[in-house]
């Protein structure tokens, strides 16, 4: 008698698990595409905020470009995730927009988008896409005062200073 009760309980548990797993798979299938579209729309809105008035084109060899950027990047624990070409109405390349992820955030990964103009090698915009920083000081990275200070700065190496920025390569 005890063996049949254990078998019945195992069978019931198996049936419940199969139904729950199937339900989760169906929900995932239904929601995967809308979630992906919403994420892509948010990413493109961020790209437009860091380089406005242009259209974006995929770069044919972007995988090679991203690998080269990651191999030569002077920043540790960071990687370039995406690179798009910014083109004007005439199809001329006016800059690039890229997203990158740094694993050096205090609370985890920090993902950013940045636009760079090829005409003057200046940053056209900067936006934090996602972060897990602590409320207070770390989360201030999403405030306009912080993000807007990058626009117009040299796309080369930037230095963080405690006092007011005195040169094109400093942020405060």
Where are these regions (language model features)?
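Flexible, solvent-exposed loop/hinge segments and secondary-structure transition points
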Residues: 1-172
């Amino acid at each position: 008698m005890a063996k049949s009760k254990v078998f019945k309980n195992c069978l019931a548990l198996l049936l419940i698990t199969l139904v729950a797993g199937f339900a989760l798979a169906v929900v995932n299938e239904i929601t995967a595409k809308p979630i992906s579209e919403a994420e892509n729309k948010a990413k493109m809105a961020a790209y437009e905020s860091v380089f406005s008035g242009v259209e974006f084109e995929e770069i044919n060899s972007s995988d090679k470009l991203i690998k080269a950027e990651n191999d030569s990047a002077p920043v540790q624990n960071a990687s370039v995730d995406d690179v798009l070409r910014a083109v004007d109405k005439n199809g001329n390349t006016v800059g690039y927009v890229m997203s990158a992820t740094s694993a050096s955030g205090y609370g985890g990964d920090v993902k950013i988008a940045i636009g760079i103009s090829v005409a003057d090698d200046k940053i056209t915009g900067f936006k934090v896409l996602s972060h897990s920083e602590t409320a207070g000081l770390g989360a201030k990275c999403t405030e306009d005062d912080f993000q807007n200070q990058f626009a117009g700065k040299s796309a080369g190496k930037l230095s963080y200073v405690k006092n007011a920025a005195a040169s094109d390569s400093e942020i405060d």
